[in-house]
Swiss-Prot record:
Keywords: Cytoplasm, Methyltransferase, Nucleotide biosynthesis, Transferase. This is Thymidylate synthase. Catalyzes the reductive methylation of 2'-deoxyuridine-5'-monophosphate (dUMP) to 2'-deoxythymidine-5'-monophosphate (dTMP) while utilizing 5,10-methylenetetrahydrofolate (mTHF) as the methyl donor and reductant in the reaction, yielding dihydrofolate (DHF) as a by-product. This enzymatic reaction provides an intracellular de novo source of dTMP, an essential precursor for DNA biosynthesis. Gene3D superfamilies: Thymidylate synthase/dCMP hydroxymethylase domain. Homodimer. The active site is at residue 159. GO terms for molecular function: thymidylate synthase activity. (6R)-5,10-methylene-5,6,7,8-tetrahydrofolate binds at residues 51, 182, 276.
Length: 277
């Protein structure tokens, strides 16, 4: 994960001080890209311990289309707690956009704690998988979480806004565009999450996982994360672990947490830091 360390150093050396929505203040660098070949191993940051349960369960939650944090809390994941309302709802965030993009406004009716929508919307993930199978040379395999009509109703507009899949010579690649990138807390999770998504997509469509390409808009380090970043940069990245899927899964929506096994992850101790809300 030297790429990640190099990105942190670039921001510290070349970034500019900026104010931000949270009032915390950042050093920001606009426009950055990192590439992680999955043939090198599964890209988990090793210079601090990551909470793997949060990464895996959050992605399964996105793919389910759910936007209430109940599932996350039931599985020991608290990373969305600060943004949820008193009922645990977040509005039409990632899962809704991935699975029901442009569904009409919610009604007053509620089923199983979830607001009912007037229209079904576009299931972008299912459409993408269908396209991988029918037109693997397509350059139109895109899923967008950024829906301007829904942004005002979201608890937090999507930071990782759009992702694209490309199949080349039997290998599947995935590129993420992230408009806003919290380099210390958020980005290590995002790298792992979308690399996991690439592995899952490749598994259910019969391709070899290729590269995860991470394109960042505003890449920033919060002012109250400086000590933590400097500590992390004193540590040396270790060899990457491997990710094993323990059973044959035919649908991406059928994966379970127990299907994933990370082998050889030997990180340095966790480094705590406050979340800017």
């Amino acid at each position: 994960m030297q790429q990640y360390h190099d990105a942190l150093r670039t921001i510290l050396e070349c970034g500019e001080e900026s104010t931000d929505r949270t009032g915390t203040g950042t050093i920001s660098y606009f426009g950055m890209q990192m590439r992680y070949p999955l043939s090198d191993g599964f890209p988990l940051v090793t210079t601090k311990k990551l909470h793997l349960r949060s990464i895996f369960h959050e992605l399964l939650w996105f793919l389910s289309g759910d936007t209430n944090i109940r599932y996350l809390q039931d599985n020991g994941v608290s990373i969305w707690d600060e943004w949820a309302d008193e009922n645990g709802d977040l509005g039409p965030v990632y899962g809704h956009q991935w699975r029901a993009f442009s569904a009409l406004s919610p009604t007053e009716e509620v089923k199983d704690g979830e607001p009912l929508y007037l229209g079904r919307g576009v299931d972008q993930v299912t459409n993408l998988i269908d396209m991988i199978k029918s037109s693997p040379d397509s350059r139109r395999m895109i899923v967008s979480a950024w829906n301007p009509a829904d942004v005002p109703r979201m608890a937090l507009p999507p930071c990782h806004a759009l992702w694209q899949v490309r199949v080349l010579n039997g290998r599947m690649h995935l590129q993420l565009y992230q408009r806003s990138a919290d380099m210390f807390l958020g980005v290590p999770f995002n790298i792992a999450s979308y690399s996991l998504l690439l592995v899952m997509l490749a598994h259910v469509t019969g391709y070899e996982p290729g590269d995860f390409v991470h394109t960042l808009g505003d890449a920033h380090i919060y002012s109250n994360h400086m000590d933590q970043v400097n500590l992390q940069l004193t540590r040396t990245p270790k060899p990457l672990p491997t990710l094993r899927i323990n059973r044959q899964v035919s649908s991406i929506f059928d994966f379970r947490y127990e299907d994933f096994e990370v082998i050889g992850y030997d990180p340095d101790p966790a480094i705590r830091a406050p979340v800017a809300v």
